[in-house]
Amino acid sequence: MRRLAVIAALGLALLGSVTAQADEAAGHYNLALQYKREGNTSAAIGECETAVKLRPDYAAAHFTLGNLYRAQGDYARAAGEYEKTVKLQPKDADAHTNLGAAYARLKRSDEAIRELETALDLKPDDYEAQLSLGFAYKQQGDYKHAIEHLQKATELQPDNPQGWANLGVAKSKTDDKEGAIVALKKAIALKSEDADLHFDLAVVYRRQKNTDAAIAEYQVAVQKNPKFAKAYYDLGMMYSQQRKNPEARAAFEKYLEYGSHEDAGYRKDAEERLKAFKGTASSDGQVAHAK
């Protein structure tokens, strides 16, 4: 009897310890949520990390920690937390969606597609899952399936520019350039200050050989983002085609001012074109002097 009493006492003590640890984990998690609402991401991460150390099976804390890492652009750590979440809660559609989106950001498109298809099996009308699945297919160059899911995303949230933007870019990779223009214009109507949208539309016009329309959109892109290096480079190329050398020279100079040194090919080309412009100007000056 005494032995049974000792075992029972130990069991109650262990249960009490586990309960206390779970309560402590919940306290840290609730504090993490408060920090998150206040915009203090680093403090929120610290509290979430403490919560999952105290209670490794705390699915909600793993999911929130994944979201916090994702907000910082740390998709590898985010994916790790979402992986733990789906193991603990395999029927959680949002966890599969966020894991798939993180995989897509990490260019693990096969795994992204698997997770996002699972998410849509659980929750067919989920905008984020449709959008991310379209993005993952676009990464693979499967524009047919990308367009299918991105089109669905725009139907679910027609006032969200992200769906239209991705749909436009996907269609621009096919023969449906007019469809791409329509989609990108809808995105711009919803978010006119986004320089990237104007750049994407300019690229479509350029592929159509609609030089004037392309230049107009590139100009808007650099107005919205005065340090948009690639837009300046493309502008320089378009002006060169029109033999507008002063405008081309100014655009290439802006590209060299703001462009990354990692883009060695573009930098070398811009530098060589500027040298050619200077040589032309020098020759023109000599001819004028001779006259």
Language-model region placement:
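Structural marker of alpha-solenoid helical repeat scaffolds
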Residues: 54, 88, 122, 156, ...
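N-terminal leader/linker segments that initiate helical-solenoid repeat arrays
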Residues: 18-49, 53-55, 59, 64, ...
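Terminal, low-structured helical/coil segments at or just beyond the last alpha-helical repeat
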Residues: 25-26, 241-291
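Helix-start (N-cap) detector for alpha-helical repeat units in TPR-like alpha-solenoids
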Residues: 24-26, 59-60, 93-94, 127-128, ...
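Structural signature of tandem alpha-helical TPR/SEL1-like repeats
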Residues: 37-50, 71-84, 106-118, 128, ...
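Bacterial N-terminal signal peptides
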Residues: 7-16
